[in-house]
Amino acid sequence: MPIDITSNESKNAMKNEEIINNKVHLENTNNNPNNNNNNNNPNNNESLLIAEATIQEEDLKIIVNEIRFKDQLRNKGFGEVFDNEFILNSLETLYLLSNNKLKLFGKKEYNFSSFLKILLKKDKKILTKYLIFRDLRSKGYVVKEGFGFGTDFRIYERGEHGKKPSKYVSIGINEGLNIKSKDFVNTVDQIEKMGKDTVIAVIERRGEVIYYKTIKMSFFENKKKS
C-alpha cells in the first residue's frame, strides 16, 4: 500500500535525500518460544488482577492508590510515578478497561465507552492512537507516550522497559492521509538524532495496523562524462 507523503510544493526537499518506507513485521513477542517467564508478559491478562483507579474529572488524571495494584501494573509495563503518585495514561486506561482489567471510579464508574467519549472531546486523534497502542500491546510490547511529534510512541521489547532506552519510535498515520514530505523528513531526522529507529504505523480503513520502517538513502547527481 503506497503512502502519499509528497506534495508539489515539497518534492524538492527530497531531491538529494529520500526517506523510504519498507514494510516491516513486528514480531509477536508473546509467541517467543525462548521466553518461559509468563509473569513478565505484558499481555498476559490471565495473571493480571482487576485493578482499581480513581479519575480526577477536571484534568482526567488516573491515579492508582493501592500498593498491590501498583506493583502488578508496573510489572506489566503500565503506569508511571509522578510526584509520588502512580499514574495511568489515557491509552493504558482504555486498554485495561477494554480487557476488563480495571475498574475506574470518579463521580461514577466509567467503562471503556464512557471514558472514550470523554477523551474524544479532548483529543480527536485518541482513537487512532488507541488502535496503534492496542495492536502493539497485543504483540507483547510495552508502549509509552512519545516525544510530542503527534501520534507517536516509544516502543520497548519485552523486559527492556525501565532497563534500556526504547529502540523504536512509532508514528501513526491514517490510510489516505497526505502529509508534507518536508515535515515527515524533519520528524524522522529528529528521531534519528535521538539514536532511535522510526517505525511508521499506518492504520488501514478496516482498522488493521501495518508497520513500515524508514531507511534513509542519499542520491548523488549522475553526470555524464564529456
Regions found by a protein language model. Name each.
Residues 1-226:
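Long Lys/Arg-rich low-complexity intrinsically disordered regions in nucleic-acid-associated proteins
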